[in-house]
Amino acid sequence: PYDREKIWRHLNEMQRGNRATLTDRVIGVIDLALWDLAGRALKLPVHKLLGGFRAKVPAYASTMCGDELEGGLNSPQAYADFALKCRERGYKAFKIHTRMPPIPGTPSPKEDVAICAAVREAVGPDMALMLDCFHWYSREEAYYIGKALEKLNYAWLEEPMDEHNMASYVWLTENLTIPILGPESAEGQLFTRAEWIRQGASDLSRAGVMDVGGITPVMKIAHLCEANGVRLELHSPGAGNLQCLMAMGIPGEYYERGLLHPFLDYEEPSPWLNTLDDPMDDEGYVHVSDRPGLGQDINWGYIKENATGH
């Protein structure tokens, strides 16, 4: 576990002829395991191995995509009501994933703007709000949404267009004042992030341990962003991303906590864990564990009972 860089480079090179099976997600799982093993062997949490910078970080409530369920996220008012519920829980920021296919009539720029407006009206001016469009829109549609969000004082617009078309993101970033966040799903690990920064394709960068191949490349991206004065927001919850956030010198502003929905109790840990990876206090801060490795309190009994092989 102490040769993580060597192993990551080897896997990255092997990926060139095996991309269909040796995906970034597979490499990410291996890299996470190596960091966890190293921390456990040295009796240190991973964020301390990475350098250590903070012990807590503010979280944003990240919703599930909208639905057609009674009592779910089925209307602008439903999103507004849920935002108020999240604010009562302690969240200082709220990110919207709007409705998308196969729901009839979606994706819809006008519906997205209506949802965003309803949420802003409900929570007032002080709660940070964001929108994730999940790459559904054209340049014109993304521009329309972005201009509306500027008037609503949203913190960022995330992944509104297909990320394979970097030129469209350069155009959008140049023509809007709201910060554009990306790339999230574009292939290319740290190399794609470097090119987006060079070309000015977004204002804020984006990566996650399961998107780019683990903690090792995420920290490379963090240092790349630091050198260029660009904030890095990490994608998705989880112990790996949380450990990285606690070690980033120029931090991402938030930890993504979710995905949240009116029907779900996020405060209940997954059955393979005894406690949450990301406990949040009443002020909206997520605290990192000082347990060795990734800091997870694993329910080994559950894992043994549900193992499918050896």
Question: Which residues does each PLM region occupy?
Answer:
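Ligand-binding pocket scaffold of soluble enzyme catalytic domains
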Residues: 41-44, 49, 77-78, 90, ...
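Shared catalytic-loop signature of beta/alpha-barrel
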Residues: 6, 17, 153, 164-285
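Glycine-rich, aromatic-flanked loop segments that form ligand/cofactor-binding clefts
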Residues: 31-66, 70
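Extended hydrophobic packing segments that form well-structured cores
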Residues: 290-310
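Glycine- and other small-residue-rich loops at beta-strand/loop junctions that grip anionic moieties
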Residues: 27, 105-108, 131-135, 158-161, ...
